[in-house]
């Protein structure tokens, strides 16, 4: 399975996402998982990225992918929209937005351990 992290650098307070990127890379390498990190450029980019790269000729065509929305509610919405059109796609969330309303309502677990989700 390919683990695709879609990070929105504008999410939250616009803090530097380099530490998160480095942590994701470090954990994926340590666990030996196949991963890809993508930084969104503009609104709607996450949906377009997923659709483009999962289509024939795209880098993920024919692969089973888990897409991680790393951002706020808007990023989650875009990733869900893109992944809903990809057969067999899975979605995970790493909330780094300001409100994170989706996670407050939909996620009951307070402790999220990324490494347990990467296996």
What label would you give each PLM region?
Residues 75-87:
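Short Gly/Thr/Asp-enriched flexible loops that form oxyanion-binding sites at enzyme active sites
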Residues 9, 70-72, 94-96:
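Glycine-rich beta-strand-to-loop/alpha-helix junction loops that act as flexible
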Residues 64-70, 74-78:
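A glycine-rich beta-strand to alpha-helix segment
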Residues 1-67, 117:
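ATP/NTP phosphate-donor binding region
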Residues 14, 73-76, 97-101:
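Gly/Ser/Thr-rich beta-alpha loop segments that engage phosphate groups in nucleotides
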Residues 4, 30, 65, 84-119:
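Catalytic core of DAGKc-family lipid kinases
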Residues 45-48, 78-79, 101-102:
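Phosphate- and divalent-cation-binding pockets in alpha/beta enzyme and binding domains
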